[in-house]
């Protein structure tokens, strides 16, 4: 996924009210940009470090700029736009990066499924193959060298695991895909210390036939894309 037009750079001052962040520009002026992340962003906020933001062509938007990347003290990157995970996954499936998800004929987004009024992120279908239901999650929490999900209690994430188990029990293929948008995360594990119920459900899901995959992103101020698989420690 190319960043077009090119991202602009500033320095983080603070994130607040969940969807807003103040940044400082090179000329010393400050401005407010949109923060497209509904999570806690635990361990992802580094005041004074570089941020990169995109510009919207929509003149009706209250905030014309959107936070895309956070620089880390170690020179790495964190993808802030959690909503881009689905698009990154779709792009990687089409390009054959995710080897486990090749060989299907069609890809659909936001299809109704399950028995809890849910919509699947990605549905793959192919001749003489079971339908493949894929839930995509963005992973950015790094603690003690380990990547974790979720970064806050996630009732929605718990529901999605139940739905995936339901689809697996019906004979479909069910996949949980972690899109790792932190350049210093090399493996993913359930955050039992944050959401114990999610961790328990994930173990049950794997025993029920749900596949769990994780792919790391390569990130720069010009591009972000899924690049390589990494271990998931359930």
From Swiss-Prot:
* Pfam hit, one: SfsA_N
Record-linked HAMAP family: SfsA (MF_00095)
Q: Which family does it belong to?
A: Belongs to the SfsA family.
What name does this protein carry? Sugar fermentation stimulation protein homolog
Q: Which domain of life is it from?
A: Bacteria
Name the gene for this chain.
sfsA
Q: Which GO terms of the molecular function aspect are on file?
A: DNA binding
InterPro entries assigned: SfsA, SfsA_C, SfsA_N
Species of origin: Shewanella sp. (strain W3-18-1)
Q: Which Gene3D superfamilies match?
A: 2.40.50.580, 3.40.1350.60
């Amino acid at each position: 996924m190319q960043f077009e037009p090119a991202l602009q750079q500033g320095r983080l001052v603070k994130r607040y009210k969940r969807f807003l962040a103040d940044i400082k520009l090179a000329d010393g002026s400050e401005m407010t940009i949109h923060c497209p992340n509904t999570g806690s962003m635990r361990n992802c906020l580094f005041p004074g470090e570089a941020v990169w933001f995109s510009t919207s062509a929509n003149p009706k938007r209250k905030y014309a700029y959107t936070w895309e990347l956070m620089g880390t003290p170690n020179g790495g990157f964190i993808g802030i736009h959690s909503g881009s995970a689905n698009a990154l996954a779709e792009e990687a499936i089409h390009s054959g990066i995710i080897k486990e998800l090749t060989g299907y004929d069609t890809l659909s987004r936001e299809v109704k499924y399950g028995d809890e009024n849910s919509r699947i992120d990605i549905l793959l279908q192919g001749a003489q193959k079971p339908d493949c239901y894929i839930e995509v999650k963005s992973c950015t929490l790094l603690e003690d060298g380990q990547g974790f999900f979720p970064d806050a209690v996630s009732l929605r994430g718990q529901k999605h695991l139940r739905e995936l188990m339901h689809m697996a029990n019906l004979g479909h293929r069910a996949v949980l895909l972690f899109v790792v948008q932190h350049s210093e995360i090399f493996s993913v594990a359930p955050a039992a210390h944050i959401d114990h119920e999610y961790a328990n459900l994930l173990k049950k899901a794997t025993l029920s036939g749900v596949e769990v995959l994780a792919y790391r992103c390569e990130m720069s101020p010009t591009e972000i894309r899924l690049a390589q698989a990494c271990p998931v420690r359930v």
